[in-house]
């Protein structure tokens, strides 16, 4: 079971990734974790990565693909894997295909932008305890105050509407074209199978739709 999970920030990919990896006994592979592990291991590739990261550069697709090919030969990938946050661009998707890495399923968690903005921009946090509220779905007893201490709640920089909209526009320009790429590939070659799942409703409902698409 080799899966790519796509979806905008705030679409609920992380939650679904957890259910998929548990259900099928496969690891979740994120490029960030993989790059950090390579640097820590000090392999020749890892040293290359460290050099690029130390100079503030972006790690090239060639290096990332080489790391992925290395990573998926490890024992925990025997039953497959789930890619999280990769590929992000068409060149990465093409490089993955050219490298002979076969993918069985591409799952897009599709959520409307306005729904994502409302989900994220409504979050309020109590910094000291990490308690999270939501102005609509889980409001504090007193607006703007933590239920336990009565201290002020804050809105994190990442949760502000303009930040969320900026991240969504980056997603639409960079990653959304992958949806078309995999839809066309699926139609032409029959693999990977492409599924668009509406990421609205309860977590259980969405999970049921995702797992049924994969089985």
UniProtKB/Swiss-Prot annotation:
What segment(s) does the record annotate as region LID? 122-159
Entry domain remark? Consists of three domains, a large central CORE domain and two small peripheral domains, NMPbind and LID, which undergo movements during catalysis. The LID domain closes over the site of phosphoryl transfer upon ATP binding. Assembling and dissambling the active center during each catalytic cycle provides an effective means to prevent ATP hydrolysis.
Keyword Cytoplasm included in the entry's annotation: yes
Q: How does it assemble?
A: Monomer.
Which protein is depicted?
Answer: Adenylate kinase
Q: Which GO terms describe its cellular component?
A: cytoplasm
**Gene, per the UniProt record:** adk
- Kindly state which reaction or reactions the protein catalyses: AMP + ATP = 2 ADP
**Its Gene Ontology biological processes?**
AMP salvage
